[in-house]
Amino acid sequence: MNRIAIIDLGSNSIRFIIISVSAKGIYQLIYQEKRSIRLAEGMSDDSPFLTDAAQNRAIDCLKVYAHLAKVHQVTKTLAVATAAVRTARNGSSFLKRVHSAANIPMTIISGKQEAALGFSGVIHTIDTSEFLLFDLGGASIEISLVKNKKQLHSVSIPIGAV
């Protein structure tokens, strides 16, 4: 069995899960946690930068998650950063700090990728086949049009709850 850690670094919180995947592709949730780190705190149109304090909160949390992954004998880590890092002028340098401090390589995903991942995460939990999916995050909202359980169109708008 492989153990996979998944990290979703959002504008307001970090989600962390560990799953075990069998040879048959069946997965089991081993661990999950969500921490509010307020990464986008202090960002604005006039100051599109992640603050040092927000970066440090995120890095401290990610160090804990890296340790938990090691304790749980994780074989692969998938880590993504969303709207706050995507729009921050210092987003790339922040991810270099994350990699150096916590040894977690992260990928900045586009709004379209974020919408696709949100769709993939919920499609098997919804009984209806045609709907609009709204995924409200801290710094963006992804909206997907779904017909016949297929994502036909999606848009990411840089307006969030924070």
What is the predicted function of each stretch?
Residues 12-14, 139:
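Conserved Rossmann-like nucleotide-cofactor binding loop
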Residues 1-9, 17-133, 144-162:
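Nucleotide/phosphate-binding catalytic cleft detector across ATP-hydrolyzing
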